Amino acid sequence: MNKPARQLRIREIIQQEHVENQHDLLRLLKEKGVKVAQATLSRDCAELGIIRSKTHAGYRLLFAEEHSGRIIKGLVGMEVVSVAANETSVIVRTLPGRAHGVGSWLDQFHSPLILGTIAGDDTVLVIPDSVENISALISYIHKNLSTN
C-alpha cells in the first residue's frame, strides 16, 4: 500500500475508533489488511500531526489541531462574561482587552449566521445575517464558546 493510501486509512481509523496508542493503531491497521512497520507508523503519525492525549475516558490518539482547538475553545470561553441580544444584534461582553480575540474566534468559523463582528476593548458586536436568526445565532455563539 502506498503512503497516501496508508495515511488515509490511519486518518479514518483515528476519526472512527477510540485508539489509545500506536500499538492499538498498528493492530487495527493489520485487521484492515494494511501491513506497516512500527517505525513507518510512527513517522506517519508525526506527519499527520497525531498526538496521544489524556481524555475523560483515558488516553487517546487525536489530531493535534483537534486537541488544540478544544483548548483554545475553552480559553476563549473563559474570556466571555455574557451574551445578550435585542431585536437586531448580539452583544458579547468579555474580560477587559479580550474582545478582539473573541471576535476573531467567531470570525474564523465563517458562519452564515454571522454577517460580521466589530470588537472594542471588552465588547463584541455580532451582526446577524438576518434579524430572524437572532436566537439561532445566540445558540451558535454559546455552542462555540462552551468549554464542554
UniProtKB/Swiss-Prot annotation:
SUPFAM superfamilies: C-terminal domain of arginine repressor (SSF55252), Winged helix' DNA-binding domain (SSF46785). Gene3D superfamilies: 3.30.1360.40, Winged helix-like DNA-binding domain superfamily/Winged helix DNA-binding domain. One of its GO terms (biological process) is regulation of arginine biosynthetic process. One of its GO terms (molecular function) is DNA binding. InterPro entries: Arg_repress (IPR001669), Arg_repress_C (IPR020899), Arg_repress_C_sf (IPR036251), Arg_repress_DNA-bd (IPR020900), WH-like_DNA-bd_sf (IPR036388), WH_DNA-bd_sf (IPR036390). Its main location: cytoplasm. It holds the Pfam family Arg_repressor. The keyword Methyltransferase does not apply. Coiled coil: none annotated. Transmembrane segments: none annotated. It is found in: Cytoplasm. Pathway: Amino-acid biosynthesis; L-arginine biosynthesis [regulation]. GO terms for cellular component: cytoplasm. Keywords: Amino-acid biosynthesis, Arginine biosynthesis, Cytoplasm, DNA-binding, Repressor, Transcription, Transcription regulation. The keyword Ligase does not apply. PANTHER family: ARGININE REPRESSOR (PTHR34471:SF1). Regulates arginine biosynthesis genes. Belongs to the ArgR family. This is Arginine repressor. It comes from Chlorobium phaeovibrioides (strain DSM 265 / 1930) (Prosthecochloris vibrioformis (strain DSM 265)).
